Structure formats: structure tokens, C-alpha cells
């Protein structure tokens, strides 16, 4: 082979080698561009996801605010409801006390009339007209007492009971061997209670 042929062959090999290098460079550039494109696509997707999150967050915040407001309103409602129930109980109790006081005044005014009726029933007589009239008065007395008892009136027990200064008024001392010391031997005037309130203490004779 001549020097000329060797030179041509070397040039040809050099050209092929340069072509291969250039092809490799082009392939690398293409791969780099593809990678760049993928990265950009991923960045766009992440940005889109962030935008979605940013759009959802205000809704969640609003829901939380509404829930907090609902909880506060529920707490206020429960507090007001409890206060209203206490108010109703207080008013009911006051009304009951007022009714008791009103009945107390009325019954206190009636007691002297009851005393007079009972004194009239103690009068004795043989006349038939008198007996008939007394029987009628007795029926009226029983009806009145029963009606008052239905409304809370109670006769205070006396004879044979231990003297109690809260419900009895001692006006006479007695010396009766049939009774213990401090026991009531005789009732001089009836006493009455309205539920737990003393309308009038009983006047009694107490054994010494």
C-alpha cells in the first residue's frame, strides 16, 4: 500500500470517528432535553397540586371556624337553658310560698269563726228544734274542717303530748298524777298548723 492510500484510509477512519462522536453528543443532548422536559412536567404537576391545596385550605379553615362557632353557640345555649330552668324553679318556689302566705292569712281570719262554731256545739238542749239546728251546725263544721284539712290545715295535738314551746302555749300549770311532768293535761284552745307553719299555737295546761 502506498503512502497515499494510507493517508486516505486514515482520513476515512477519522471521519467515521468524528461522526460517531457527533452522534453521541447529539444523543446526549436529546436525552438531556427529554430529562429537562420531564422535570418541567413534574414541576408543573407539583405546582398544580400546590394550587389545589391552596384552594382546599380556605374551605377547611372555614369549616373549622363554623365548627368553633357552633360549639360556642351550643355552650351559650346550654348555659342559658340552665339559667332558665333555675329561674323557673325559683319562680315556682316563690309562687308556692306566696300561695301559702295567702292561705295563711285567710285561714287565720277563719279560725275565730271556727272557735265560735265549736263553742255553739258545746251548748246542750233538749228541744227538738235546738237539736235539729245543732245537728245542722255540726254538719257545716265538719264540712268546713275537712275542706281546710284538704288545703293543708292541721290541728295541733295536745292532751297527753309532751309540751313543745314551738307549737304550744302554756297558760296554766297542773299537778295531775295521771300525767308525767311536762305533759299536757288539758287543751284550753285549739291550735292549728298550715303545712309546716304554725297559724296559732295551742293554749294548754301543763303538768308540773
From Swiss-Prot:
GO biological process: protein folding
NCBIfam families in the cross-refs: PRK14140.1
Role summary: Participates actively in the response to hyperosmotic and heat shock by preventing the aggregation of stress-denatured proteins, in association with DnaK and GrpE. It is the nucleotide exchange factor for DnaK and may function as a thermosensor. Unfolded proteins bind initially to DnaJ; upon interaction with the DnaJ-bound protein, DnaK hydrolyzes its bound ATP, resulting in the formation of a stable complex. GrpE releases ADP from DnaK; ATP binding to DnaK triggers the release of the substrate protein, thus completing the reaction cycle.
Gene that this sequence comes from: grpE
HAMAP family: GrpE
Keywords: Chaperone, Cytoplasm, Stress response
Composition bias type Polar residues, residue spans: 13-23
Pfam entry (one): GrpE
Chief place of localization: cytoplasm
Compartment(s) where it occurs, according to its Swiss-Prot or TrEMBL record: Cytoplasm
Recorded family membership: Belongs to the GrpE family.
GO CC, alphabetical: cytoplasm
Compositionally biased intervals (Acidic residues): 42-51
InterPro entries, sorted: GrpE (IPR000740), GrpE_coiled_coil (IPR013805), GrpE_head (IPR009012)
GO molecular function list: adenyl-nucleotide exchange factor activity; protein homodimerization activity; protein-folding chaperone binding; unfolded protein binding
Protein name (database record): Protein GrpE
Region (Disordered): 1-51
Biased composition (Basic and acidic residues): 1-12
Quaternary organization: Homodimer.
Disulfide bond keyword on record: no
Amino acid at each position: 500500500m502506498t503512502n497515499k492510500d494510507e493517508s486516505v484510509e486514515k482520513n476515512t477512519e477519522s471521519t467515521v470517528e468524528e461522526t460517531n462522536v457527533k452522534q453521541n453528543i447529539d444523543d446526549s443532548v436529546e436525552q438531556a432535553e427529554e430529562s429537562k422536559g420531564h422535570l418541567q412536567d413534574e414541576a408543573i404537576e407539583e405546582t398544580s397540586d400546590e394550587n389545589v391545596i391552596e384552594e382546599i385550605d380556605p374551605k377547611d379553615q372555614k369549616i373549622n371556624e363554623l365548627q368553633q362557632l357552633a360549639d360556642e353557640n351550643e355552650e351559650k345555649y346550654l348555659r342559658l337553658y340552665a339559667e332558665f330552668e333555675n329561674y323557673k324553679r325559683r319562680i315556682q318556689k316563690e309562687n308556692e310560698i306566696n300561695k301559702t302566705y295567702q292561705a295563711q292569712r285567710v285561714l287565720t281570719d277563719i279560725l275565730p269563726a271556727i272557735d265560735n262554731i265549736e263553742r255553739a256545739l258545746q251548748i246542750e238542749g233538749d228541744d227538738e228544734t235546738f237539736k235539729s239546728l245543732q245537728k245542722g251546725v255540726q254538719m257545716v263544721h265538719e264540712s268546713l274542717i275537712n275542706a281546710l284539712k284538704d288545703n293543708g290545715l292541721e290541728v295541733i295535738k295536745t292532751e297527753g303530748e309532751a309540751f313543745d314551746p314551738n307549737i304550744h302555749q302554756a297558760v296554766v300549770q297542773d299537778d295531775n298524777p295521771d300525767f308525767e311532768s311536762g305533759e299536757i293535761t288539758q287543751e284550753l284552745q285549739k291550735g292549728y298548723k298550715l303545712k309546716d307553719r304554725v297559724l296559732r299555737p295551742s293554749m294548754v295546761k301543763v303538768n308540773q
